[in-house]
Amino acid sequence: MHKHVATNLKKKPKMPFTFSHPAIILPLKNIFGKWVSLTGLIIGSLTPDFEYFLRMKIQSDYSHTIIGTLWFNLPLGILLCFIFHDIIKKPLIENSPNFIQSRMKELKSLNWKEYFMKNWITVSLSVVIGAYSHIFWDSFTHSHSFFTNFFELNRKIEGTDIPIFKILQHLSTVIGGIIIIRYFLKQKTEIIDYSEQNIKYWINIIILTISILTVRIYLGLRITEYGNIIVSGIASGMIALTFVSLYEQRKTGGNTVYN
C-alpha cells in the first residue's frame, strides 16, 4: 500500500487544491480539544504540497510518502508554524477586512513560542496527522494510487473520457473549500479595536508576487506548463506574503504579544 501511494503520487501530480486539504482534519479539534494543535493539523495537511512550491514545479519525490512525512513534512511543518505565527499572522490579520479580524482575536493573541515550548509533542503529532490526512485524501484522487485501484476509480464515466477519480478530485476541492469557509464563518465574533487596513501591504504583496513569478518564467518556465505556472504562482505569493509581513513587523517594531 505504501509503495503504491508514494510512487503514483509522484507520477500523477494533479491534485485537489492544496488549501482545501484542512477540511478533512478540522473535526479533530472539536473531538480531541487540547490534545491536538489546530495550527499543527492545518499546516500539516498543507505541507506535502510544499515540495511543489519549494521546487516551483509539480514534482514530489519525498513529501507524499509515508517515511517522507517524518523527515520532510514534520520539520518543514514546524518551521511553517513559526513563520506563520511569528512573521505572517499579525500583519495579515490587521490588514484583513473587519469580519476576519473579529474572528481572529484569539489566534492573534496566541503566544506561539510559549505554546510550542509547552506542547511541542502535541504540535509535532498534529503536523504528522495532518500530513497523513493529505496523503490519504490524495490516494482517492490520483490515477493508479492504492484506493483508486482498489475501488476502480480509474474507470471513465460512460460516454466521456473523464475518469471517476478526476471527478472526485475536483468535487472534493469544492466541498473542502465550502467546509473551510463555513467553519471560519461559524467562529465567534468578538468586539475588538479594528486595525485600519493598509492597502500598501496588499499592493506590495501583489508586486513582489508578480516579480518573483516573472523571474521564474525567465529562468525557463514555459507559459504552457499550466500546472507549474499555478504552483509557481502560489509559491511566489507565499514568499511575497512572508517578506512583506516581515517588513511590516520590522517597520512597526512588532508587538511583544506575538513574539
Predicted segment positions?
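N-terminal membrane-targeting hydrophobic helices
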Residues: 2-259
